[in-house]
A protein has these predicted regions:
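Short helix-loop "hinge" at the ATP-lid/N-box region of the Bergerat-fold HATPase_c
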Residues: 13-14
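Short beta-strand/loop element within the Bergerat-fold HATPase_c
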Residues: 20-32
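Acidic ATP/Mg2+-coordinating residue in the GHKL
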Residues: 40
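Short conserved segment of the HATPase_c
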Residues: 45-57
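Short alpha-helical Gxxx[C/S/T] motif in the catalytic ATP-binding
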Residues: 73, 77
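Conserved glycine-rich
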Residues: 85-87
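Glycine-rich GHKL/ HATPase_c ATP-binding element in histidine kinases
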Residues: 96-98
Length: 107
């Protein structure tokens, strides 16, 4: 199911980066958690939307013109990560792209 979450995050990144855009997938580990980050240089997510992006059917203003997305992917990703006792969050600077971070406990 983690691969499904990665697919959702990568699909979103691909959909919102400009032509010849940049997407970075990074993996790291702390003593207690495994961290996955998907970073892009798309339009970003406004601060006002950061707490809402994981709600069902929510779409930020920058995503409303993208008709191939229905506002379910991030909600599904959130539920899957929660079932694994992990967290998913968005770190963002509007106009500077988005970074989604997944933190999963090692044990």
């Amino acid at each position: 199911r983690i691969s499904q979450v990665l697919g959702i995050l990568l699909d979103n990144a691909i959909s919102y980066v400009p032509e010849n855009g940049k997407i970075i997938l990074s993996l790291s580990q702390t003593k207690t958690h495994f961290l996955i980050r998907v970073k892009d240089n798309g339009p970003g997510i406004p601060d006002s939307a950061k707490t809402s992006v994981f709600r069902r059917f929510y779409r930020a203003d920058s995503a409303r013109n993208n008709r191939q997305h229905f506002g379910l992917g991030l909600c599904i990703a959130y539920e899957i990560i929660s079932l694994h006792k992990g967290t998913i969050s968005v770190l963002d600077t509007p106009g500077g792209g988005s970074t989604f971070q997944i933190s999963l406990p090692l044990a």
